[in-house]
């Protein structure tokens, strides 16, 4: 197979080469327009947007205007921000517009690149979403690129976590909306819980560009977005089960599977749990919930580690993001795991939540007509992007070749030997004033290393979830001569580490608002690094205040320049990895912090055989080799065999994690199909003022089901007319039905259906007429939405419990996923049937009194027994309207009986 691939590569070129060949001619077309754009006045350039929109309205495609649109953005960027898009950024923009992932190295200007595709697609008028990993980056990028969009007459909105409903609606109505993946996802869920179409904030899902796409679509893919409310279940069970765990003995009672991050009870362990709890059979059907919580408690104690997976702050268990090391305040583990951790740490246990709405990032982002992404590290996950999202990864070459030197890993036998070697390396780097970024995989490891450095008298900064408030300051100083910065994973990602430290003088220039020509020329000289000229301009200034401020800025530039030169001489930023991550991509992200835009830099990873990756997934051959070589303590090993073993271990873990994400998606796809049906039905009700045709179809179906259930066949003597009459009375529909009348007909069952259906429809129309058609329309929509939301909430709860216990079917050699699909479909079918029946029952029995008010918005019905009472506020027109009392019939929704269709 490899031979064939090599032959094809020689004939066709590599994928990288083929991709570039497709992009280069288009970049040539864009460049050919540059001279024309430079000669265009500001007013004509800003009018391009309207011209493009008119051409699109006439049927021209976005592809056909791409060269002109991209050339326009490049010229506007140069005029407004002094930044000209490089050719490689043009390539990135084309890749994004075509719905691909553009892999661009750190420092290559992904934010500026995105403006090309964002502007072009915004011309369609359907809204473009730019997705970032946090609020800070969303706001920063929007404000940073806003001058380009303002010049071109394109509106920009930003979604922030603390925004209210109206602010969000305004932001989404803009041509371009920046925000985080969480905010976009939660707003979608909330939009499908509103009571009026005007209360929705999002428009269509037309085009999205996801920044740090690997972080959002892969790292966070295992975490669904959930809107929940507290359930009525007690938290006592968590305390009770938590007390069991210390009594269980490892190996005898349970086995820890570190690879799968799971704990399995042995037969002896099952017996032990049964004995402690005083039950006969732990795996009896009624104990499925108990088994689930025992397993969650075991995981909480044996898999999840404090200061690695979570921290305890102010009496709360807070999740630590395994990929960035950031605290995820407000996020909770689902399925009772978070409660198990709270019980373990003896803090207040929050009630387990009940799902009201949920979606995974996979299914949310797959809704977009076109999806694109940017990152510095996507190629190692190209298969997953292609299979799950139908996204191709296009590797964009750097504008300036990477000069960073990546040294081979150094492997030690023990963690102590590794840390001793790291300490020695940091000492040496600091002695020659080379800044070093030390990457760790957990808060715990970062604090161990910090204590060692403090004991050795080495000044350093720590950037982890516990010190996130100082993140910007720490990252700003990480490039200073001799700076030592310890960071968990990719904390600080999204902010470049500048060699020599942050260029604070640029902020001073921006905040200095003065129209004086000398001040303007001074600023230009500083930005061009023409320091001698800047000094001359200071002497010409007529104000001592201005001279003082300018001198301070010039001095800070000189200090930064000296620091910058010292770091360049020392070799640039050095990356010191203290452990390999499970994914090669995360290691590459750490390395990518150094060597930006052609800067010098270096990197090396220090490993030990006690590291989790080596211990759990590594080969025993490495350990055997080091013992065989009789290596003295502290001696490292560098060999191709070791490097290959590490790469194989990482590939195994990546494959394992991909399987987990794929498996989760297969389960969520079941819910997604159901979600689509419910949301489509909900939107149909929101979009249409008159839903009478939908209600009439429900009535017809309800009548049909009752007749099939009680009056099957064409022999009236065998019919159960009493049960049918009881159902009709429940609808307050008094209808004379005599079996003798139907014996004379050609098709008795059809004749019965037509009579009952006609009477039911007439009753419905009479009710609408008596209450008033306008009030009735609003009333039936409100009632429909209330019942729909209630039934959907109940169904989600049932599906959660089904999923928790579905694994038990594996004991009878049935496929849990297949069984989940089958049972989930049956449950959904019943939920829809119950919804239709309940809507019909409510509408036939609703009572409306005079001199009260009907709301513009529905309010939730409060159920007491079988009565539902809702008090209404007022119509938007101010018309007085009634209080509504709704009583359901005792014949509520039941499981649908399988039946043949009636004959007509």
From Swiss-Prot:
Keywords, comma-separated and alphabetical: ATP-binding, Cell inner membrane, Cell membrane, Cytoplasm, Membrane, Nucleotide-binding, Protein transport, Translocase, Translocation, Transport
The protein's Enzyme Commission number: 7.4.2.8
Class of the enzyme per the UniProt entry, highest EC level: translocase
Any GO CC annotation of this UniProt entry: cytosol
Membrane topology, as annotated: Peripheral membrane protein
Entry binding sites for ATP: 89, 107-111, 496
Protein's cellular compartments: Cell inner membrane; Cytoplasm
Positions of the UniProt region annotated as Disordered: 870-904
BP GO terms, sorted: intracellular protein transmembrane transport; protein import; protein targeting; protein transport by the Sec complex
Family statement drawn from the similarity comment of this UniProt entry: Belongs to the SecA family.
Assembly and binders: Monomer and homodimer. Part of the essential Sec protein translocation apparatus which comprises SecA, SecYEG and auxiliary proteins SecDF. Other proteins may also be involved.
Name assigned to this protein: Protein translocase subunit SecA
Organism the protein comes from: Leptospira borgpetersenii serovar Hardjo-bovis (strain L550)
